[in-house]
């Protein structure tokens, strides 16, 4: 169903190989592994207990937060895996692109790499995928930090997502920017200003703008046509990168994750409203919500502050929540 979403523009601007995206139940996601540079316990084994998997947002990639994960790995003395979702970064292009499929990809990654008691750090799109993974396979995961998202349907964000995708599509299809133009990124930035005035958001999206073929070939993009391109198959992601990202599946009654889950909420963001907090309390009873003075783009606006909050959560905060939950359970039995 999703693979037929091909956007055809006028003949002058068509630069895509006219084939559909393949449909795959799961894909092997590309990843980077961040190990502590100096370990207090000597040489750290590759498969240590309780590694962390960092899960990026829409149009993000494992490269976005390289420095953050290096810092967290050293602060927490544990390996951190950063992944690329399908249709992102270095991972292959394929459909479907929905929460059920992305969650299955994440669970497949954890099981394939034999990760023992991993925890998750999920941001935005990656936050919802992380939450669904906790609910689908609660015994597989130890804990999580969910960054600025909640387990609810969010139709209010669809208009913004449509603008983001339109800006990406029109920049590669209508701006006429050649790959050999040394100012290609600056020109792409200028063109995107027609749709997105915010410099931070443009910078985030432009990390996907390339003038050379990437490591992963795409069945739908001709990277050798002399023009700039996006790493993501944006022309083939109409609707799925909007309605599906704003969606949230129906969770059967009684399903919950009882492990400790931290939620980092931007006070200038609308991604964790009261309906979201109610859903969090129901599905993740052993939670703690942290506020940070930022919009939804917390990781770009408050990098040092959010890294500190995340590190403190995994060092001590989650254990405090576990102790409190155990105390409540004991009192309930009396």
From Swiss-Prot:
Specify whether Hydrolase is a keyword of the entry: yes
Catalytic residue positions: 124, 148, 296
Q: Which UniProt keywords apply?
A: Hydrolase, Mitochondrion, Transferase, Transit peptide
Q: What is its main location?
A: mitochondrion
**Among the entry's GO cellular component annotations, what is one?**
mitochondrion
Species whose genome carries this gene: Hanseniaspora uvarum
Stretch forming the transit peptide: 1-16
What InterPro entries does the record tag this protein with?
A: AB_hydrolase_1 (IPR000073), AB_hydrolase_fold (IPR029058)
In UniProt terms, what function does this protein have?
Answer: Alcohol acetyltransferase that catalyzes the synthesis of ethyl acetate from ethanol and acetyl-CoA. Can also function as a thioesterase by hydrolyzing acetyl-CoA in the absence of ethanol, as well as esterase hydrolyzing ethyl acetate.
Top-level taxon: Eukaryota
Signal sequence: where? none
Q: Which family does it belong to?
A: Belongs to the AB hydrolase superfamily.
What is the designated name of this protein? Ethanol acetyltransferase 1
Q: Which GO terms describe its molecular function?
A: acetyl-CoA hydrolase activity; carboxylic ester hydrolase activity; transferase activity
Q: Where in the cell is it found?
A: Mitochondrion
**Reactions this protein catalyses:** ethanol + acetyl-CoA = ethyl acetate + CoA; acetyl-CoA + H2O = acetate + CoA + H(+); ethyl acetate + H2O = ethanol + acetate + H(+)
């Amino acid at each position: 169903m999703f693979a037929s979403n091909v956007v055809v523009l006028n003949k002058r601007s068509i630069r895509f190989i006219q084939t559909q995206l393949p449909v795959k139940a799961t894909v092997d996601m590309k990843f980077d592994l961040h190990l502590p540079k100096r370990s207090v316990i000597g040489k750290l084994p590759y498969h240590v207990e309780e590694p962390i998997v960092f899960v990026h947002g829409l149009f993000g990639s494992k490269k976005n937060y390289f420095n953050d994960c290096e810092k967290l790995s050293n602060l927490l003395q544990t390996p951190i895996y950063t992944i690329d979702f399908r249709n992102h970064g270095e991972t292959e292009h394929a459909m479907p692109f929905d929460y059920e499929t992305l969650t299955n990809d994440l669970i497949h990654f954890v099981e394939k790499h034999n990760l023992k008691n991993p925890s998750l750090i999920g941001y935005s799109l990656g936050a919802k995928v992380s939450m669904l993974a906790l609910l689908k396979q609660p015994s597989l995961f130890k804990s999580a930090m969910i960054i600025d998202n909640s387990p609810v349907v969010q139709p209010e964000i669809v208009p913004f997502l449509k603008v983001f995708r339109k800006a990406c599509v029109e920049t590669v299809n209508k701006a006429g920017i050649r790959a050999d133009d040394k100012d290609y990124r600056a020109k792409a930035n200028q063109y995107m200003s027609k749709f997105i005035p915010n410099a931070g958001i443009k910078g985030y999206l432009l990390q996907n703008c390339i003038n050379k073929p990437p490591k992963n070939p795409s069945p739908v993009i001709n990277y050798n046509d002399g023009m700039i391109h996006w790493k993501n198959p944006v022309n083939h992601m109409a609707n799925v990168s909007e309605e599906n990202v704003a969606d949230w599946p129906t969770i059967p009654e009684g399903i919950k994750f009882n492990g400790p889950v931290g939620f980092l909420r931007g006070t200038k963001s609308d991604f964790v409203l009261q309906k979201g907090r109610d859903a969090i309390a129901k599905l993740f009873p052993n939670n703690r919500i942290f506020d940070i003075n930022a919009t939804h783009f917390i990781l770009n606006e408050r990098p040092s502050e959010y890294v500190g909050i995340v590190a403190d959560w995994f060092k001590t905060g989650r254990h405090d929540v576990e102790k409190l939950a155990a105390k409540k359970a004991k009192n309930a039995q009396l």
